[in-house]
C-alpha cells in the first residue's frame, strides 16, 4: 500500500493480507508450543482427537502466548493496521483454535448469529482476523461472511 492510499473498508468485504511468514513466524512458535516439528502433521500424533484433547492443545497455545505477545502486537499494528487503519484495541490473548480433519465441535454458523441481543452497531466495528498456521484450501478453510 502506498502513502496516501485509502484504507480498505472491511465492513462489507473480506480482505486477504499477505505478510512475511519468516518475520512473523507464528508457525514455529505454535509447533514448539504443541511439541511437534510439523504442525500440519499434528493429527498423526493422536488416534482420535477428542474435545478434551482439542481444548488441551488450545490451552497449551494460550499458556505460551507471552512468548509471541510482542510479535503479535507488531503484526497487528504494522501489517493489519496498514490495511484496515489504526487498531484501537484487540483481544489479548487471542482465541486459539485447533481443528483436526473430520472433527467439528460446533455447528456451522455465522459469528453475527451468535451475538444475540448485543447491539449490532457495536459488533460491526469488530473484525475477525484469521491467521492460519497450515496451508488452507477448499473445505480446509473458513467460510468468510
Regions found by a protein language model. Give the residues of each.
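Generic structural motif
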Residues: 22-24, 101, 134-136
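N-terminal auxiliary "cap/dimerization" subdomain that precedes the catalytic jelly-roll/cupin core
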Residues: 1-85
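N-terminal start-of-chain detector that recognizes signal peptides
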Residues: 65-70, 94-103, 111-117
